[in-house]
Structures are given as structure tokens and as C-alpha cells.
Design a protein with these regions (language model features):
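Active-site acidic/histidine proton-transfer and metal-coordination neighborhood
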Residues: 12-13, 20-21, 38, 59-62, ...
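Short secondary-structure boundary segments
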Residues: 77, 136, 218
Length: 251
């Protein structure tokens, strides 16, 4: 039996969200006397990291998200450059709205100077979002703290596993931000966290008060050798992850 790409993705997403439910469908017919229990409310807001479409233009990206029934995107600068004019930003939002997609954040944006931090915060303000996914140099964190207070934004540091020295895992982000403004936290990339030898489920539980965004992926190994693979075929325990997301009220 053949399935369309849309059917494949929608069935896969539905299956993933059902993993954390408290009841399992039973083969027996429901009792005709007892009223049916209300359906569980899905608390999650499923979005897409703009970087996923690094090799695709904005039109293709938005058409794909619409087909997949995904309505949120983290805006990457190759789709909306940091030096965009206000008119270009309005046109970007209009195009997103035509496909029922909303930009909820910008990034990841790498920041190696105070000037680059200033530019990123100004960009986010003009775009109209309150969350920046960023990667600042360690020594710039006090300046990020200052800007978060000034703009009243949340700032989620994207962790990168063993591939680069800065922010390899959730614990590293926590240790560098725990004494800063509580609006500074992390984008928990569960694949990279595992690739650095960590347990993303345990890390979500420990650090959930500072988890402002998540990148969901599966990987083949809990080491630098791990590479991306279809969800369910790798090493991440997704039923446990979904249960933990519910437990800590991550939405």
C-alpha cells in the first residue's frame, strides 16, 4: 500500500505524540453504558528549526511546512537576513501567514563580539519575536545578561555536542548560565546532548527551568561518531523523552 509523503509525516508525528499518553487503545469495544472519556489535550507546539531547510528557499520551506501541518518556525538568517529592512520583514511575515506559519524565534545566531550581540537583539526586536537562539562566546555572557534585562527577551543557547568546544551539552550551558538572569537558558538539542555522552531525558528533568526551546532528532550513537537517523531507529528513548516533557510541563 502506497502512502503520500504528507500521510507518512502526519502518521509519524501523531504516533510520536501518542507515546506519552496515559492510556493505550484496546481491542475490546467500549462499554455502551459508560460515557467516553474526553480526549487528552496535546500541550505541545510543534515547530521547525529553520536550519533544517538550509538548502531550500523560503517558498519551498513554507510549502513543505504547510503540507506537514506545522505552523511554527525558528527563523534563520538565510531566509531573513539580519540586515533586512522593515519592509522586507513585513513581506516575510506576510508570506509566512499565507502558509499559516508563524516565526516564534530567530537563530541560531553566533555572536563573537558585543556588536554582534547588539545586532542580534535589534534584529529580533524588529522581527517581532521574544526568543533568540544564540551561541555567544563564553566571555560575552555578562553582556548577554545585560541585553536580556534591557529587552526582556529569553535567550536559548544552542548546545552542539562534541563538534565544537563551546556549549557541548546541557550541563555546560547550565553551569555557565545558572547565576545569570533566569531568562537565559538553553535550546536542548537532544541529539547533540546524547552525542556528548549525556542523557537528554535526565538533563531535561534537571534543567527544565532553563529549557526554552528543543531540537528533536535521533542519532545512531552516544558519541561523536553518532549521526542523524530517523526517529525511532537511533539511541534516544523517545517514549521516555515525551513522558518527561509532560512531567515538567514543557510545551
Amino acid at each position: 500500500m502506497k502512502h503520500s509523503r504528507r500521510t507518512f509525516f502526519k502518521q509519524g508525528l501523531a504516533g510520536a505524540l501518542l507515546l506519552g499518553t496515559s492510556t493505550i487503545a484496546r481491542a475490546a469495544l467500549p462499554d455502551p453504558v459508560k460515557p467516553k472519556a474526553p480526549k487528552a489535550v496535546n500541550p505541545f507546539h510543534l515547530g521547525m528549526a529553520g536550519y533544517t531547510f538550509v538548502n531550500f528557499d523560503l517558498d519551498t520551506t513554507l510549502k513543505t511546512l504547510e503540507r506537514l501541518d506545522i505552523h511554527y518556525i525558528c527563523i534563520k538568517d538565510f531566509h531573513l537576513p539580519l540586515n533586512s529592512t522593515d519592509e522586507q520583514i513585513r513581506a516575510f511575515h506576510d508570506k509566512c501567514a499565507a502558509h499559516k506559519v508563524t516565526g516564534y524565534a530567530v537563530g541560531p545566531i553566533y555572536m563573537k563580539s558585543e556588536e554582534e550581540i547588539d545586532r542580534a537583539f535589534d534584529y529580533a526586536k524588529r522581527v517581532g519575536v521574544k526568543l533568540i537562539v544564540g551561541v555567544p562566546n563564553y566571555e560575552l555572557l555578562p553582556y548577554v545578561d545585560k541585553k536580556v534585562k534591557e529587552y526582556d527577551f529569553h535567550y536559548a543557547i544552542h548546545l552542539h555536542g562534541p563538534d565544537i568546544k563551546t556549549y557541548p551539552d546541557a550541563t555546560d550551558v547550565w553551569e555557565h548560565t545558572k547565576d545569570l538572569d533566569p531568562r537565559i537558558g538553553m535550546c536542548l538539542d537532544v541529539g547533540h546532548d546524547l552525542r556528548n555522552g549525556c542523557d537528554p531525558v535526565a538533563d531535561l528533568k534537571k534543567y527544565h527551568t532553563r529549557v526554552f526551546d528543543m531540537h528533536i532528532k535521533d542519532v545512531t550513537d552516544s558519541s561523536k561518531a553518532g549521526v542523524g537517523i530517523e526517529i525511532g531507529r537511533g539511541k534516544i528513548d523517545f517514549p521516555a523523552l515525551i513522558r518527561m516533557m509532560r512531567e515538567v510541563n514543557y510545551t
